[in-house]
A protein has these predicted regions:
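Hydrophobic, aromatic-enriched alpha-helical segments typical of multi-pass transmembrane helices
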Residues: 1-243
Length: 244
């Protein structure tokens, strides 16, 4: 089956987001009998029981995922730029670019920061045996990174979600009816996490653990809309299929 260069780039981005999901599970998922208690804002007692290899692989998934994330979202931006040519539409394309470039720059760092915070807590406790002191040190590391983390969240997750919802309901994306637009409105990190992710938390273990990957899955679903856009653009002759 023939596959366009554009389609392969979008799929590469989806693979990158899938690596994010795997990394999120490795970092945050807990066993049925593990403690769900937290110390301070971000430190979970369960980190003490987690194998170090989980954090190492999680960081690797974050780094590799970021490279593939850029490939996919850069391709979707190029499609949007080609498809949306009116001045009022172009401002949303620009905001989409700001959002995905923020993600490219920051998500690898953010992912590594969270996992390193867990490792600092784990290793400090193993060395000195003081859980409260270890948690205090780890939380201080988080607080030092809180400002860029919040900025990344606003400029990528929030902005990307707003842009996608606007594009959907202003009919900038080729969706055929209201039902498709309602379904597509879930295809972003904020709505998918806020609704679907929170619903998973109500389920018994291990289904409740699915919540940990829903933010990254929301980014993956944005690229799924990119595949829909590419398909319709090819039908209309807006972009020619490139076969290698």
């Amino acid at each position: 089956m023939k596959s366009s260069k554009e389609k392969r780039a979008l799929i590469a981005g989806m693979i990158g987001c899938s690596l994010y999901v795997i990394g999120d599970f490795l970092f945050a998922a807990t066993g049925k009998t593990q403690s769900t208690e937290s110390i301070g804002l971000m430190v979970k007692v369960a980190y003490l029981d987690m194998a170090t290899w989980r954090m190492v692989v999680s960081i690797i998934c974050g780094v590799l995922g970021t490279a593939l994330y850029y490939i996919g979202f850069h391709q979707m931006w190029k499609l949007l730029k080609r498809h949306l040519t009116q001045p009022k539409q172009q401002k949303w394309v620009k905001l989409f670019q700001i959002a995905y470039l923020t993600g490219t720059v920051c998500w690898g760092y953010v992912h590594a920061m969270f996992t390193n915070m867990a490792l600092i807590f784990k290793f400090t406790f193993e060395k000195y045996g003081d859980m409260q002191a270890a948690a205090e040190i780890a939380n201080k590391v988080f607080y030092c990174n809180a400002a860029p983390l919040l900025a990344s969240y606003i400029l990528c997750d929030v902005l990307l979600s707003v842009v996608m919802i606007v594009m959907i309901w202003k009919k900038m994306l080729p969706l055929k009816n209201t039902a498709q637009r309602i379904l597509a409105s879930f295809c972003n990190p904020i709505v998918f996490t806020g609704i679907v992710g929170n619903l998973f938390t109500l389920l018994p273990w291990p289904l409740d653990q699915i919540d940990h990957g829903t933010e990254s899955a929301g980014h993956l679903l944005v690229l799924a809309l990119g595949l829909v856009l590419l398909r319709e653009m090819m039908k209309c002759g807006e972009c020619k299929e490139t076969v290698q």
